[in-house]
Structures are given as C-alpha cells and as structure tokens.
C-alpha cells in the first residue's frame, strides 16, 4: 500500500500507550494499526517492528520509541509506544514525545501493578492532561465480578492521582484477539470502541498560535537610530507590531512595546509560533535585555525561583555522572536558553540519587526564571548534561 499523503484537513492529536510491562501496550499498538489498515487509514506495523524501535537521542538521552500513525473519521493520530519502562520515564520527563492524551493499558488478569501506578503519577506530574483505559486480556478472566473489581481498582488509582477516575472511559477487550482479526466483541469491535473513546474523550489540543505569546530571548543587539532588537524563535502565540510585551526573568519584569518584527531581513506585521524573528523593543537599552529572559504577553507568565520537579538522571553510558549526588547538590539548571545555578532538596528518606534514577525533588534557583508547570529543563555540570527534568509545580 502506498503511503497516503498526510491529510491536513483533520485535526492532529498526539497519543501514546502507557502501563505496566507485559500488559499488552505494544500488542495493542499493533492491533490499532492493523485494524485501521483494513480501512485504508494506517500502515500495519507488526509487533516486532514496534518492539525493535530504534534508539533516538533526545538532549543526549538515549530513548527507544516507536512512532506509528493512523486516522479515524474525525482525526489524524501520531502514537508513541516504548519498549522498556526506562524509555517511558525518559520520554515523559524530556517531553520527547509530547502526549495530548494517553491510552493506559491494564491487564485484566493482573490488575494495576507498580508501573501502572508510576506511569499514572508521571502523567500527572509532566502534564499529560487526559487518559483513556484499555482493559486488556479480558478473555483470560472468566469471573465477571473479578473484572468489575479490576475496573474499580483502576478507577480508584486514577482518582488517587487526581484524574477523574469515575468519568474516564474504560474499554474492555483483547489486543491479541484483535490482532488476530477476531470479530467477536473483545476483538476488532473493542479496538473501534477504544478509538471512539479516544476521539470523543481526548480533546483536540489548542494550536500553538492560539496560546499567549512567548519568545525566549536568544540574542540582543542594538541598531543605531532604531533601538534594541531581541531575537529568538516564537514558542507560542502571535506578536503583532504595536503590541505591549513583558520582559520576564533574571531581572525585575519590564514592560515594552514591540515596534517592529523582522524575519529573513524583511519587516512583517506579525510573528507567530515557530517563526525565528527579531523584535524591535521600544525604550529599552541593549543592557536591559539578555539571553535567558522571555518576551511574553503581559500577565501570562511570572518569574520564580522555587519549584518541584520530576527528574531523570542520566547514566554514565549516556554521558552522565558516574557517581550519585546528595541533598544540597548544586548544578546548573538550563531553562530554554540559559543556565541558572540551583540547589536540590531530596524527598524525606532519600539519601542519594544514582545515575539512571528518576526522582521528584525541590529546587531553589539563585535567580528567577519565567516559569510554569510543564516547563522542561536540563541539569548540567560545566556545560555537560547530567539530567533532564520537568516543572511539576511552581512554589514561589
């Protein structure tokens, strides 16, 4: 089958399978592609193709991830599946594969297991906003009461991590049966039911251009007779000439007006998400703006020094530390375009953190950075990346 051209006419949504090892994430992923392929809406990816996902490097971290795509009547989906538990942890923390929603796979024969819990917690911490559950291997459970019990357990676990456990759709089926082309209710119809649930329950994400304007400052220079220009790539939103922006981070927040937007040496009326622009700033001196600050829609983002984070610590094979670190560890935290020193407070009862661990921690920076929940950062020592993290909660 020829690769169909990417249809721009359907909304695009990023999803992924999460859950405990051997509960059937990869089998389900294969079954979805097979089912959609019968309708000409995907290319079938066999279990082995997905399981042998090539390793990718994201910010120096090795992550094995399989990417598949498929369409429903309503949408086009990009779907990620990871072979190993560590790959999931790294993926979710680095945001290498941003998920608008997740499909949590739970084996009905085993019920929720430790990684089920850990993946739900990670999803909560890193800001995966929505979840749909596929209760797999239902054909292996004869007792209806046992099945109801597992469903209840899953709902309670989701509620425990502040997901709406009572509302979340739970679809029962057998990924293996579906993959074998079984037409009984646990086979292909269960896949259709799951796709319907994902279509209706996971909302289409806001496009980057609809969000409030933000541009990390990469460089600053002055143009004689015109003023100060800050350059960078617009992360989100739109900036129009004549609009007011705030310069946030590192120094007290300053207000200014963008009097010109330049791209490829041409003057524009506006710059939008994805554009590399130069923004001409009224009334600011060259030394009042610096790399590491952001230009943002007034009131949309504030500077902070203290936050809770979810962090993955690189192994020495990934170029990370060879030794553990302890409470009070003081590395650099690289946010967007700059390094800021900060000190680490480990959770009560945690003595040290080993390379390869993932851990929740509190961080206090020595200078404030424009910050919000879900912001990604790297942990560095002398320019070398030793960890990756995401802001789980802003404290002050």
From Swiss-Prot:
Binding of GTP occurs at 19-26, 81-85, 136-139
Residue ranges, annotated region (G3): 81-84
SUPFAM superfamilies assigned: EF-Tu/eEF-1alpha/eIF2-gamma C-terminal domain, P-loop containing nucleoside triphosphate hydrolases, Translation proteins
What is the annotated localization of this protein?
Answer: Cytoplasm
Q: Region G2: which residues?
A: 60-64
Location of the region described as G1 in the Swiss-Prot/TrEMBL record: 19-26
- Cellular-component GO terms for this entry: cytosol
Q: What is its EC number?
A: 3.6.5.3
Cited InterPro entries: EF-Tu_GTP-bd, EF-Tu_GTPase, EFTu-like_2, EFTU_2, G_TR_CS, P-loop_NTPase, Small_GTP-bd, T_Tr_GTP-bd_dom
Annotated GO molecular function terms are: GTP binding; GTPase activity; translation elongation factor activity
UniProt-annotated binding residues for Mg(2+):
26
Query: What are the start and end residues of every segment in region (G5)?
Result: 174-176
Q: Domain (tr-type G): give its ranges.
A: 10-206
Q: Does the keyword Protein biosynthesis apply?
A: yes
| G4: annotated segments | 136-139
User: Which keywords accompany this UniProt record?
Assistant: Cytoplasm, Elongation factor, GTP-binding, Hydrolase, Magnesium, Metal-binding, Nucleotide-binding, Protein biosynthesis
The catalysed reaction is:
GTP + H2O = GDP + phosphate + H(+)
**Family under the similarity heading:** Belongs to the TRAFAC class translation factor GTPase superfamily. Classic translation factor GTPase family. EF-Tu/EF-1A subfamily.
* Biological role stated in the UniProt entry: GTP hydrolase that promotes the GTP-dependent binding of aminoacyl-tRNA to the A-site of ribosomes during protein biosynthesis.
Q: What is this protein called?
A: Elongation factor Tu
Its encoding gene is what?
A: tuf1
């Amino acid at each position: 089958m020829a690769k169909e051209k990417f249809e721009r006419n359907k909304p695009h949504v990023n999803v992924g399978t999460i859950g405990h090892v051997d509960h059937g994430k990869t089998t389900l992923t294969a079954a979805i592609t097979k089912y959609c392929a019968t309708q000409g809406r995907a290319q079938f990816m066999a279990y082995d193709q997905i399981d042998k996902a090539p390793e990718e490097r994201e910010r120096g971290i090795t992550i094995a991830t399989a990417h598949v795509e498929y369409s429903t009547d309503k949408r086009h989906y990009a779907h990620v599946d990871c072979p190993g538990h560590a790959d999931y942890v790294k993926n979710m923390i680095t945001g290498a594969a941003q998920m608008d929603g997740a499909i949590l796979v739970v084996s009905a024969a085993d019920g929720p297991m430790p990684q089920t819990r850990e993946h739900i917690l990670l999803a909560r911490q890193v800001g995966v906003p929505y979840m749909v559950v596929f209760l797999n291997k239902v054909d292996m459970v004869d007792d209806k009461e046992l099945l109801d019990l597992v469903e209840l357990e899953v709902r309670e676990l989701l509620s425990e991590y502040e997901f709406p456990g009572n509302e979340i759709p739970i679809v029962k089926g057998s990924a293996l049966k579906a993959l074998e082309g079984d037409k009984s209710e646990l086979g292909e119809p269960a896949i259709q039911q799951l796709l319907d649930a994902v279509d209706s329950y996971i909302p289409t994400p806001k496009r980057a251009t609809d969000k409030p304007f933000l541009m990390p400052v990469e460089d600053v220079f002055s143009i004689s007779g015109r003023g100060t220009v800050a350059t960078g790539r617009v992360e989100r939103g739109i900036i129009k000439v004549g609009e007011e922006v705030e310069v946030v981070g590192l120094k007290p927040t300053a207000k200014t007006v963008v009097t010109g937007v330049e791209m490829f040496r041409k003057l524009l009326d506006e710059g939008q998400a994805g554009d590399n622009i130069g923004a001409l700033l009224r009334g600011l001196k060259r030394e009042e703006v610096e790399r590491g600050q952001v230009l943002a829609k007034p009131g949309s983002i504030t500077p902070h020094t203290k936050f809770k984070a979810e962090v993955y610590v690189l192994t020495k094979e990934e170029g990370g530390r060879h030794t553990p670190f302890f409470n009070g560890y003081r590395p650099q935290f690289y946010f967007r375009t700059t390094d800021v020193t900060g000190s680490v407070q480990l959770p009560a009862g945690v003595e040290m953190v080993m390379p390869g661990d993932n851990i929740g921690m509190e961080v206090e920076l020595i200078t404030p950075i424009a910050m919000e929940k879900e912001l990604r950062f790297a942990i560095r020592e002398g320019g070398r990346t030793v960890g990756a993290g995401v802001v789980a909660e802003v404290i002050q």
